[in-house]
């Protein structure tokens, strides 16, 4: 998006959040900053707590009395994945600390009047040097490498640009409350990888079906995290895309050069802001000078 002004903010600092809010005076805040690596959240719970819970608490405290719409991006991992087809009224029972931390974030967000919470699972084109599941599958297949796909782990992942369209519609309708948002149907992660291989014309035989039980993860994972999205479809009067339609949109944007355009645009923002990528964070010249002054 051209012509967008940006600013940096420490999301775990209430003071930093208040300064950025004062500078931009937003009418809508979309809170999607999160530590999403499930294994890393389990191994470093303190960091996960700071990023996923404390940041949300700081944000809520900063805007609780302000006339601002808050939209929070949560996760399908708040459900236990035992039976699948989860609706918003089903019991929340996260199996890992990532899911726990995101649900704690939901509870904070619920303190804000008229807030909107989306429980979702997304894939798309990343700005930073990390990959969504869709990107990882595509990169591996492009290199003609075999990959494993869980045949017994299902989900309702939705393409990010389709999700953005849904958020836009929800804003226009002033939607509030908790909603599942995913593809209108579901598939296993093995089937998801095969669908990408098929859509991008790669060898489907490179995708091998395995059981999630064959992997010794630190964090327990739900097997059936497919979502019932009827509530959202009814409120928006909008048909959510199927998994196939999401993957087709993913492919369409790939052919149009969107991944390169995203990387190019973010590089321009970094140059204009004198910001340097460092791991999952950005540091600027002021940060560097502060470190030098202490050495």
Enumerate the language-model features and the residues they cover.
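Amphipathic terminal alpha-helices
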Residues: 243-295
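NAD(P)-dependent short-chain dehydrogenase/reductase
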Residues: 107-155, 161-162, 168-169
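Mid/C-terminal beta-alpha module of Rossmann-like enzyme folds, strongest
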Residues: 166, 173-219, 223, 258-266
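NAD(P)H-binding glycine-rich loop region in Rossmannoid oxidoreductase-like domains
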Residues: 11-51
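Rossmann-fold cofactor-recognition segment
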Residues: 2-13
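Substrate-binding strand-loop-helix patch
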Residues: 126-128, 153-164, 181-199, 241, ...
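Catalytic helix-loop patch of NAD(P)-dependent Rossmann-fold dehydrogenases
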Residues: 50, 54-58, 78-118, 122-125
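NAD(P)-cofactor binding segment of oxidoreductase domains
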Residues: 43-71
């Amino acid at each position: 998006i051209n012509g967008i002004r940006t600013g940096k903010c420490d999301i775990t600092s209430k003071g930093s959040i208040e300064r950025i809010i004062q500078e931009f005076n937003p009418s809508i805040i979309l809170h999607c900053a999160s530590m999403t690596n499930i294994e890393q959240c389990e191994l470093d719970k303190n960091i996960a707590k700071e990023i996923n819970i404390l940041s949300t608490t700081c944000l809520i405290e900063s805007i609780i009395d302000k006339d601002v719409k808050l939209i929070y991006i949560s996760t399908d991992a708040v459900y236990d994945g035992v039976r699948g087809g989860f609706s918003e009224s089903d019991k929340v029972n996260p199996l890992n600390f990532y899911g726990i931390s995101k649900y704690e974030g939901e509870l904070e967000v619920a303190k804000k009047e008229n807030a909107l919470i989306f429980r979702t699972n997304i894939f798309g084109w990343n700005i930073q040097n990390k990959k969504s599941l869709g990107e990882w599958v595509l990169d591996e297949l492009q290199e003609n490498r075999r990959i494993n796909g869980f045949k017994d782990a299902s989900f309702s992942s939705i393409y990010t640009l389709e999700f953005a369209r849904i958020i836009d519609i929800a804003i226009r309708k002033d939607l509030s409350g908790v909603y599942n948002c995913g593809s209108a149907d579901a598939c296993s992660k093995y089937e998801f990888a095969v669908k990408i291989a098929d859509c991008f014309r790669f060898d489907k035989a490179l995708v091998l079906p395995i059981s999630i039980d064959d992997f010794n993860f630190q964090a327990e994972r739900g097997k059936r995290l497919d979502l019932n999205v009827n509530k959202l479809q009814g409120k928006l009067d909008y048909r959510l895309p199927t998994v196939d339609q999401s993957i087709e949109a993913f492919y369409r944007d790939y052919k149009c050069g969107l991944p390169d355009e995203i990387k190019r645009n973010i590089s321009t923002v970094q140059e204009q802001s004198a910001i340097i990528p460092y791991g999952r964070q950005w540091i600027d010249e002021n940060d560097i000078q502060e470190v030098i002054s202490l050495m």
